[in-house]
């Protein structure tokens, strides 16, 4: 069926083809059917939506399609019903617990990227991985398939280093220190980061306070080959595009299949051309990996996967039992990171973790002797070389290299929670801190978040400040206060924890 393109000002997060009732009847198409939209140069797939607002002979194309493909108003395309993809049969095989072949995994990933698989089929695939898992062969095939269906970066400056945290710890602005330290030592580190999904601030959200993070692959190549580093948002790039679609299914189902997590992380490192990769695995209460033995098992999988991809991988199991530094939220974290890198000193948890991770990378890259990486990283931080490199990164990405911490606007609607009793801080709940910061408006409101006045192990007196909530509106502040009162974000206990008498 021939149809003229009509561009619709609609965004749904899906590839949809809007057609008239008359055309649907003539073509024997029903809502939700998969169709091919063909031109002389390309074929894409979409789900049928029948609409009275579309005239016979037209096909409505949404912004979602236009973000990936170019169509012009009135362009003539061919609309063809599509059969169920062969990859659906492969998904059923995995649902039945069978091992998939390389070509089968490649077909599934290709069909996800081309939108031949619908949301329910992608969800079935993700669920099958959660239930039946993947062996290391399958994970390696999935990783390369995810990378090779998207763009690949080729940087001439070698060696190429990379670092990734699997997340879960609030206030993790560590890479804003790690990347400049490593680059200042002469290594190349093109760092792509994510925006927050369930956290109060992703690294990209924090960096965006200092400089633009949305750049094309060509711009990234130019920046990195000039100064050796970048801090950009990976979501603006076509890196491992299947990942975004599987993440939607994971989020909806509240699952995170281990094999898919490994492939998701390493496919982006593979696409960036990373040769030496450091994986940070925070461990502790309230993070993704709570037990050290589970962290060690995951570390072995990352290392083995790296070998199969031709990458040298090391892992760092780090303490994740409380937030890093004293701030949570984009602007608050950017301010704290900038203060630390300018002064060459700052909160112990931030400096220790940043120099620890950077030190490992310096040793991996061969610029520091074994066991001396952390010392070298601290020297680079304290000397001001890391700050100078951060200024270069900010300038090349289009920001003001002379920005100062006091220039960063913070939410001016505040409320401080105080200790109701004297004692010692025995616990700071990561999930509660994140929930309160998000209720305050983070990460969408850059100035929203939390300033912690205490850390675990510190002694407090009654009425001492515990944490301050920052918001950009009174309504958001009220929501955060309500959220904080419902939870126990900070626990205070005396030296006597419990009294037990005669029974």
From Swiss-Prot:
Belongs to the thymidine/pyrimidine-nucleoside phosphorylase family. Type 2 subfamily. One of its GO terms (molecular function) is AMP binding. One of its GO terms (cellular component) is cytosol. This is AMP phosphorylase. The lineage of its organism: Archaea, Methanobacteriati, Methanobacteriota, Thermococci, Thermococcales. Signal peptide: none annotated. It comes from Thermococcus sibiricus (strain DSM 12597 / MM 739). Gene3D superfamilies: 1.20.970.50, 2.40.40.20, Nucleoside phosphorylase/phosphoribosyltransferase catalytic domain, Pyrimidine nucleoside phosphorylase-like, C-terminal domain. Pfam families: Glycos_trans_3N, Glycos_transf_3, PYNP_C. It comes from the Archaea. PROSITE patterns: THYMID_PHOSPHORYLASE (PS00647). AMP binds at residues 168, 194-199, 203, 264, 288. Keywords: Glycosyltransferase, Transferase.
């Amino acid at each position: 069926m021939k149809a003229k393109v009509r561009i619709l000002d609609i965004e749904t997060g899906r590839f949809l083809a809007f057609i008239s009732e008359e055309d649907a009847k003539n073509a024997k198409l029903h809502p939700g059917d998969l169709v091919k939209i063909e031109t002389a140069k390309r074929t894409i797939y979409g789900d049928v939506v029948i609409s009275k607002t579309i005239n016979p002979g037209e096909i409505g194309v949404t912004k979602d399609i236009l973000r990936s493909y170019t169509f012009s108003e009135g362009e003539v395309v061919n609309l063809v019903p599509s059969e169920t993809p062969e990859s659906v049969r492969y998904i059923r095989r995995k649902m039945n617990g069978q091992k998939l072949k390389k070509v089968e995994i490649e077909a599934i990933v290709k069909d996800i990227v081309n939108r031949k698989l619908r949301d329910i089929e992608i969800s079935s695939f993700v669920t099958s991985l959660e239930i039946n898992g993947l062996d290391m062969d399958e994970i390696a095939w999935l990783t390369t398939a995810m990378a090779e269906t998207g763009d690949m970066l080729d940087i001439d400056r070698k060696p190429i280093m990379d670092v990734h945290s699997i997340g879960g710890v609030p206030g993790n602005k560590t890479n804003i220190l790690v990347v400049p330290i490593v680059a200042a030592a002469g290594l190349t580190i093109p760092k792509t980061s994510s925006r927050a999904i369930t956290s109060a601030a992703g690294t990209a959200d924090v960096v965006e306070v200092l400089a633009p993070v949305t750049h094309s692959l060509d711009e990234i190549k130019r920046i990195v080959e000039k100064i050796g580093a970048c801090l950009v948002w990976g979501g603006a790039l076509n890196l491992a595009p299947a990942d975004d679609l599987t993440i939607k299914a994971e989020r909806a189902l509240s699952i995170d299949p281990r094999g898919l997590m490994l492939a998701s992380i390493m496919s982006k490192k593979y696409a960036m051309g990373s040769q030496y990769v450091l994986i940070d695995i925070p461990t502790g209460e309230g993070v993704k990996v709570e037990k050290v033995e589970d962290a060690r098992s995951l570390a072995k999988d990352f290392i083995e996967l790296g070998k199969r991809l031709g990458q040298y991988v090391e892992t760092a199991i780090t303490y994740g039992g409380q937030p890093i530094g004293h701030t949570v939220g984009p602007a608050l974290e950017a301010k704290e990171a900038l203060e630390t890198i300018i002064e060459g000193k700052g909160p112990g948890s931030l400096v220790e973790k940043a120099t620890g991770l950077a030190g490992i990378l310096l040793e991996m890259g061969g610029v520091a002797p074994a066991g001396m990486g952390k010392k070298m990283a601290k020297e680079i931080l304290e000397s001001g070389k890391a700050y100078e490199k951060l200024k270069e990164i900010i300038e090349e990405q289009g920001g003001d290299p002379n920005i100062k911490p006091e220039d960063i606007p913070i939410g001016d609607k505040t409320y401080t929670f105080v200790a109701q009793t004297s004692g010692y801080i025995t616990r700071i709940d990561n999930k509660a801190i994140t929930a309160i910061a998000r209720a305050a408006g983070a990460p969408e409101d850059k100035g929203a978040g939390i300033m912690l006045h205490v850390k675990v192990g510190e002694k407090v007196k009654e009425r001492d400040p515990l944490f301050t909530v920052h918001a950009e509106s009174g309504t958001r502040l009220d929501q955060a206060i309500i959220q904080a009162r419902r939870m126990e974000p900070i626990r205070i206990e005396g030296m006597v924890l419990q009294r037990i008498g005669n029974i």
